[in-house]
Design a protein with these regions (language model features):
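Residue(s) in the substrate-gating loop at a strand-loop-helix junction
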Residues: 141
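Active-site helix of classical SDR
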Residues: 121, 157
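The beta1-alpha1 cofactor-binding region of Rossmann-like NAD(H)/NADP(H)-dependent oxidoreductases
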Residues: 38-39, 59-70, 103
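Substrate-binding pocket helix/loop in short-chain dehydrogenase/reductase
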Residues: 97-98, 102-108
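Conserved glycine-rich cofactor-binding loop
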Residues: 13-14
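Conserved glycine-rich Rossmann-like NAD(P)H-binding loop of the short-chain dehydrogenase/reductase
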Residues: 29-43
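C-terminal helical subdomain
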Residues: 181, 201-241
Length: 265
């Protein structure tokens, strides 16, 4: 295998995915950036090229398992057989009262946010197993701490991501593969431009895409303490860390009351 590490990122054309692609490129990775937005991928590749680093980009609909497998295989071949990091970032977010959102829209959110992760994990596994010290990073959310009103379906998809992360970190540990999840709160990206809920009003939208990208890089190469404790979930930002800690040590009834009050603010 080549000495240069590689990272495959879904949803890489914009927002968190793009910031993460650039961050890993600046840290010497061969970057695989995949998305349905071919035009923005071209500009991402140009930007990485300007950094003097290498990018491989291509169209990818994460809900298509065959295309996902094809793109992962193509990238690993281009990266000389390595897949050091797999980042399942692609996702959408629908906000509003559950009954006001069309059922077809709910289904699409489930397809992208859950089936897209399954497709990525399944396609990446043989390459991760063949690459010593490989890591999977799944983009979950602080909404996987407790179900969020006006984000009910989205929150449910992120609980799925949380669960599959925990399970596969145990299953794949025998192959030396770490599986971790990021838990950001609201992030200033195009996905949240039109989102207005009780919790966005009470907590604000404070994180940037770069905040998440920086923490993803740290999660891939964690501190000795995080490595010793085998940290699986990484809340991003002060608010998410506070919420995660409070939920861990508070009784369920108190956590529910706190979330209800935030949603009604």
């Amino acid at each position: 295998m080549t000495e240069k590490k590689s990272v495959f990122i879904t949803g890489a054309a914009a927002g968190i995915g793009r910031a993460t692609a650039l961050t890993f490129a600046k840290n010497g990775y061969v970057v695989g950036g995949y998305d349905i937005d071919d035009i923005s991928l071209k500009s991402l590749a140009d930007e990485i090229d300007d950094l003097g680093e290498r990018a491989v980009t291509g169209h990818l609909d994460v809900t298509d398992p065959d295309e996902t497998s094809l793109r992962v295989d193509e990238f690993v071949t281009a990266a000389a057989g390595r897949l050091d990091v797999m980042i399942n970032n692609a996702g959408i977010q629908l906000a509003g009262r559950f009954e006001d959102i069309a059922v077809a829209a709910h289904h699409r959110e489930i397809d992208i946010n859950t089936k897209g992760v399954v497709n990525g994990l399944h396609a990446a596994f043989p390459h991760l197993r063949a690459t010593p010290g490989s890591v999977v990073v799944n983009l979950a959310s602080a909404s996987a701490i407790y179900g969020q009103a006006e984000l009910a379906n989205y929150s449910a998809t992120k609980f799925f991501v949380r669960a599959i992360t925990e399970a596969l970190d145990i299953e794949w540990g025998q192959y030396g593969i770490r599986v971790v999840a990021m838990w950001p709160l609201y992030v200033q990206t195009a996905m949240t431009d039109d989102v207005k809920t009780g919790t966005t009003e009470s907590l604000g939208i404070r994180l940037t895409a770069q905040d998440i990208a920086d923490d993803i890089l740290k999660a891939v190469d964690p501190s000795w303490l995080r490595r010793m404790t085998h940290q699986v979930h990484f809340p991003v930002g002060t608010q998410a860390k506070t919420m995660a800690t409070a939920a861990r040590f508070s009784p369920a009834w108190l956590t529910r009351i706190a979330n209800k009050r935030l949603a009604q603010s």
